[in-house]
Amino acid sequence: MATTKYEVTYIIKPDVDEESKKALVENYDKVIADNGGTMVESKDWGKRRFAYEIDKYREGTYHIMTFTADNADAVNEFGRLSKIDNMILRSMTVKLDK
């Protein structure tokens, strides 16, 4: 089976403190690794203003992860967890070209 490269961008609420944000990022990096993904890069893009309001917030902290995986388990688990996590406003997963 071919290894696929993915990029996940997610937005963290702006009122989350640094310690909680760091724990959240480490947790999601671990979710990817625990589900068969290999982390290539995980970086903070910082706080940015939105073009429109999301859940009564006008800005959020962007974080981007790039990883490889042999199957979609890591992507599916991240998607499931990010939907129920109240610290994440939005997330987007993109399959990158080989």
Curated annotation (Swiss-Prot):
Coiled coil: none annotated. It comes from the Bacteria. The keyword Ribonucleoprotein applies. Gene3D superfamilies: 3.30.70.60. Keywords: Ribonucleoprotein, Ribosomal protein, RNA-binding, rRNA-binding. GO terms for biological process: translation. Pfam families: Ribosomal_S6. The keyword Membrane does not apply. GO terms for cellular component: cytoplasm; ribonucleoprotein complex; ribosome. GO terms for molecular function: small ribosomal subunit rRNA binding; structural constituent of ribosome. Binds together with bS18 to 16S ribosomal RNA. Belongs to the bacterial ribosomal protein bS6 family. NCBIfam families: S6. This is Small ribosomal subunit protein bS6. It comes from Lactobacillus helveticus (strain DPC 4571). The gene is rpsF.
